[in-house]
Protein backbone atom coordinates (compact mmCIF):
# COMPACT_ATOMS: atom_id res chain seq x y z
CA UNK A 1 0.00 0.00 0.00
CA UNK A 2 1.37 3.43 -0.98
CA UNK A 3 0.63 5.38 2.18
CA UNK A 4 1.78 8.74 0.81
CA UNK A 5 -1.02 8.70 -1.78
CA UNK A 6 -3.82 8.14 0.76
CA UNK A 7 -4.67 11.45 2.41
CA UNK A 8 -8.39 11.32 3.18
CA UNK A 9 -10.98 8.95 4.62
CA UNK A 10 -12.53 8.51 1.17
CA UNK A 11 -9.21 7.37 -0.30
CA UNK A 12 -8.69 5.12 2.71
CA UNK A 13 -12.05 3.41 2.10
CA UNK A 14 -11.15 2.87 -1.56
CA UNK A 15 -7.82 1.30 -0.58
CA UNK A 16 -9.57 -1.52 1.28
CA UNK A 17 -7.79 -0.81 4.58
CA UNK A 18 -9.56 -2.36 7.57
CA UNK A 19 -9.51 -1.10 11.13
CA UNK A 20 -8.34 -3.41 13.92
CA UNK A 21 -7.51 -3.02 17.61
CA UNK A 22 -3.90 -2.88 18.78
CA UNK A 23 -4.29 -6.23 20.55
CA UNK A 24 -5.49 -7.79 17.28
CA UNK A 25 -2.51 -6.20 15.52
CA UNK A 26 -0.08 -7.75 17.98
CA UNK A 27 -1.83 -11.12 17.80
CA UNK A 28 -2.06 -11.25 14.01
CA UNK A 29 1.55 -10.17 13.48
CA UNK A 30 2.81 -12.67 16.07
CA UNK A 31 0.96 -15.49 14.29
CA UNK A 32 2.35 -14.31 10.94
CA UNK A 33 5.91 -14.14 12.27
CA UNK A 34 5.63 -17.66 13.65
CA UNK A 35 4.30 -18.98 10.34
CA UNK A 36 7.29 -17.37 8.59
CA UNK A 37 9.75 -18.64 11.24
CA UNK A 38 10.74 -15.11 12.23
CA UNK A 39 11.96 -14.76 15.81
CA UNK A 40 11.07 -11.25 16.92
CA UNK A 41 12.70 -11.78 20.31
CA UNK A 42 16.09 -12.95 19.01
CA UNK A 43 17.91 -10.25 21.00
CA UNK A 44 16.50 -11.58 24.28
CA UNK A 45 18.65 -14.44 25.57
CA UNK A 46 17.90 -17.08 28.18
CA UNK A 47 14.10 -16.87 28.15
CA UNK A 48 13.26 -19.15 25.22
CA UNK A 49 11.61 -21.77 27.44
CA UNK A 50 10.22 -19.54 30.18
CA UNK A 51 9.32 -15.89 29.65
CA UNK A 52 8.91 -15.79 25.86
CA UNK A 53 6.31 -18.63 25.64
CA UNK A 54 4.28 -16.99 28.43
CA UNK A 55 4.56 -13.62 26.70
CA UNK A 56 3.35 -15.09 23.42
CA UNK A 57 0.39 -16.75 25.13
CA UNK A 58 -0.54 -13.42 26.72
CA UNK A 59 -0.40 -11.70 23.31
CA UNK A 60 -2.45 -14.45 21.66
CA UNK A 61 -5.01 -14.13 24.47
CA UNK A 62 -5.02 -10.32 24.03
CA UNK A 63 -4.08 -9.69 27.66
CA UNK A 64 -2.28 -6.72 29.18
CA UNK A 65 1.09 -7.72 30.63
CA UNK A 66 2.97 -7.32 33.91
CA UNK A 67 6.67 -8.25 33.89
CA UNK A 68 7.93 -9.18 37.35
CA UNK A 69 11.68 -9.52 37.85
CA UNK A 70 14.85 -8.20 39.42
CA UNK A 71 16.99 -5.40 38.00
CA UNK A 72 18.79 -6.19 34.77
CA UNK A 73 16.45 -8.98 33.67
CA UNK A 74 15.44 -7.25 30.42
CA UNK A 75 11.88 -6.36 31.47
CA UNK A 76 11.92 -2.99 29.71
CA UNK A 77 13.85 -4.34 26.73
CA UNK A 78 11.22 -7.03 26.15
CA UNK A 79 8.46 -4.41 26.45
CA UNK A 80 10.18 -2.21 23.86
CA UNK A 81 10.58 -5.16 21.50
CA UNK A 82 6.77 -5.47 21.23
CA UNK A 83 6.82 -2.49 18.86
CA UNK A 84 8.09 -4.84 16.13
CA UNK A 85 4.73 -6.67 16.31
CA UNK A 86 2.79 -3.56 15.29
CA UNK A 87 1.78 -2.74 11.72
CA UNK A 88 4.37 -0.50 10.05
CA UNK A 89 1.91 2.38 9.54
CA UNK A 90 -1.64 3.14 10.68
CA UNK A 91 -3.89 6.02 9.55
CA UNK A 92 -4.97 8.67 12.06
CA UNK A 93 -7.19 11.73 11.71
CA UNK A 94 -4.93 14.68 11.03
CA UNK A 95 -4.62 17.02 13.99
CA UNK A 96 -6.01 14.59 16.56
CA UNK A 97 -4.00 14.35 19.79
CA UNK A 98 -5.65 10.98 20.53
CA UNK A 99 -4.52 9.23 17.32
CA UNK A 100 -8.15 8.83 16.24
CA UNK A 101 -9.00 5.88 14.02
CA UNK A 102 -10.52 7.48 10.87
CA UNK A 103 -13.32 4.88 10.87
CA UNK A 104 -13.98 5.05 14.61
CA UNK A 105 -12.92 8.37 16.17
CA UNK A 106 -13.19 8.69 19.96
CA UNK A 107 -12.24 12.34 20.53
CA UNK A 108 -14.76 15.15 20.20
CA UNK A 109 -12.38 16.83 17.74
CA UNK A 110 -12.28 13.72 15.55
CA UNK A 111 -16.03 13.14 15.67
CA UNK A 112 -16.81 16.76 14.75
CA UNK A 113 -14.28 16.76 11.91
CA UNK A 114 -15.68 13.54 10.40
CA UNK A 115 -19.23 14.87 10.76
CA UNK A 116 -18.29 18.10 8.95
CA UNK A 117 -15.90 16.77 6.30
CA UNK A 118 -17.10 13.21 5.73
CA UNK A 119 -14.95 11.38 3.19
CA UNK A 120 -12.83 14.52 2.75
CA UNK A 121 -11.55 14.30 6.33
CA UNK A 122 -7.74 14.55 6.12
CA UNK A 123 -5.64 11.73 7.53
CA UNK A 124 -1.97 11.18 8.21
CA UNK A 125 0.08 8.03 8.78
CA UNK A 126 1.68 7.08 12.10
CA UNK A 127 4.78 4.87 12.10
CA UNK A 128 5.02 2.08 14.65
CA UNK A 129 8.11 3.72 16.21
CA UNK A 130 5.81 6.55 17.33
CA UNK A 131 3.34 4.18 18.96
CA UNK A 132 5.30 3.45 22.11
CA UNK A 133 4.97 5.49 25.30
CA UNK A 134 7.03 4.79 28.39
CA UNK A 135 6.54 6.31 31.84
CA UNK A 136 8.67 5.71 34.91
CA UNK A 137 6.43 5.46 37.96
CA UNK A 138 7.61 7.79 40.70
CA UNK A 139 5.83 8.93 43.88
CA UNK A 140 5.23 12.39 42.40
CA UNK A 141 3.24 11.13 39.38
CA UNK A 142 -0.33 12.50 39.50
CA UNK A 143 -3.66 11.57 37.94
CA UNK A 144 -3.58 14.65 35.64
CA UNK A 145 -0.15 13.51 34.38
CA UNK A 146 -1.54 10.14 33.31
CA UNK A 147 -5.19 10.83 32.52
CA UNK A 148 -5.63 14.58 32.12
CA UNK A 149 -7.16 17.70 33.63
CA UNK A 150 -9.01 20.87 32.76
CA UNK A 151 -6.73 23.55 31.29
CA UNK A 152 -7.86 26.94 32.70
CA UNK A 153 -5.45 28.87 30.46
CA UNK A 154 -6.93 27.28 27.33
CA UNK A 155 -10.44 28.00 28.64
CA UNK A 156 -9.56 31.66 29.21
CA UNK A 157 -7.81 32.12 25.86
CA UNK A 158 -10.63 30.48 23.89
CA UNK A 159 -13.33 31.98 26.14
CA UNK A 160 -14.82 28.57 26.79
CA UNK A 161 -16.84 27.25 29.71
CA UNK A 162 -15.20 24.67 31.99
CA UNK A 163 -17.96 22.28 30.90
CA UNK A 164 -16.72 22.36 27.29
CA UNK A 165 -14.75 19.26 26.24
CA UNK A 166 -12.29 21.49 24.38
CA UNK A 167 -10.77 22.67 27.68
CA UNK A 168 -9.53 19.17 28.55
CA UNK A 169 -5.78 18.70 28.43
CA UNK A 170 -5.38 14.95 27.98
CA UNK A 171 -2.67 13.08 29.88
CA UNK A 172 -0.22 10.46 28.67
CA UNK A 173 -2.66 7.55 28.64
CA UNK A 174 -5.36 9.04 26.35
CA UNK A 175 -2.60 10.44 24.11
CA UNK A 176 -1.32 6.86 23.80
CA UNK A 177 -4.53 5.65 22.16
CA UNK A 178 -3.72 2.88 19.64
CA UNK A 179 -0.25 2.57 21.18
CA UNK A 180 1.72 0.44 23.61
CA UNK A 181 1.87 2.15 27.01
CA UNK A 182 4.51 1.00 29.48
CA UNK A 183 4.64 1.95 33.16
CA UNK A 184 7.98 0.98 34.65
CA UNK A 185 8.30 0.20 38.38
CA UNK A 186 4.53 0.11 38.96
CA UNK A 187 4.90 -0.44 42.76
CA UNK A 188 6.29 3.10 43.07
CA UNK A 189 3.00 4.50 41.77
CA UNK A 190 0.80 5.67 44.63
CA UNK A 191 -2.08 3.25 45.39
CA UNK A 192 -4.71 5.90 44.59
CA UNK A 193 -3.11 6.40 41.17
CA UNK A 194 -3.12 2.66 40.54
CA UNK A 195 -6.81 2.56 41.48
CA UNK A 196 -7.51 5.32 38.93
CA UNK A 197 -6.18 2.97 36.24
CA UNK A 198 -8.77 0.30 37.07
CA UNK A 199 -11.59 2.09 35.27
CA UNK A 200 -9.46 2.45 32.16
CA UNK A 201 -8.31 -1.17 32.21
CA UNK A 202 -11.73 -2.65 32.91
CA UNK A 203 -14.44 -0.23 31.79
CA UNK A 204 -12.76 2.39 29.56
CA UNK A 205 -14.22 5.09 31.79
CA UNK A 206 -12.15 8.28 31.86
CA UNK A 207 -12.93 10.72 34.66
CA UNK A 208 -11.41 14.18 34.37
CA UNK A 209 -12.36 16.79 36.96
CA UNK A 210 -16.12 16.90 36.54
CA UNK A 211 -16.25 15.14 33.17
CA UNK A 212 -17.53 11.57 33.17
CA UNK A 213 -17.64 9.99 29.75
CA UNK A 214 -16.83 6.68 28.16
CA UNK A 215 -13.80 6.78 25.95
CA UNK A 216 -13.03 3.38 24.41
CA UNK A 217 -9.26 3.77 24.50
CA UNK A 218 -7.40 1.18 22.45
CA UNK A 219 -4.20 0.66 24.41
CA UNK A 220 -1.96 -2.31 25.13
CA UNK A 221 -0.71 -1.83 28.69
CA UNK A 222 2.60 -3.25 29.88
CA UNK A 223 3.79 -2.92 33.47
CA UNK A 224 7.13 -3.80 35.03
CA UNK A 225 7.80 -4.44 38.71
CA UNK A 226 10.71 -5.46 40.91
CA UNK A 227 9.72 -7.81 43.79
CA UNK A 228 12.36 -6.18 46.01
CA UNK A 229 10.85 -2.76 45.39
CA UNK A 230 7.25 -3.63 46.10
CA UNK A 231 8.13 -5.26 49.42
CA UNK A 232 10.43 -2.47 50.60
CA UNK A 233 9.09 0.69 49.03
CA UNK A 234 5.64 0.24 47.54
CA UNK A 235 3.03 -2.28 46.55
CA UNK A 236 0.81 -3.40 43.71
CA UNK A 237 -2.86 -2.77 44.41
Regions found by a protein language model. Give the residues of each.
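Conserved ASCE/P-loop NTPase catalytic core
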Residues: 2-236
Amino acid sequence: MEYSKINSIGELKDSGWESKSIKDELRDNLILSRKNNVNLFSQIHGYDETVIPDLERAILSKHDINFLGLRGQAKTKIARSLVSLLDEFIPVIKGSVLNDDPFNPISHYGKELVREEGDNTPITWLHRSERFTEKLATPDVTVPDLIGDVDPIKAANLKLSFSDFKVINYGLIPRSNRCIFVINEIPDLQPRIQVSLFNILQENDVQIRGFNFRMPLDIHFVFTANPEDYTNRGNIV
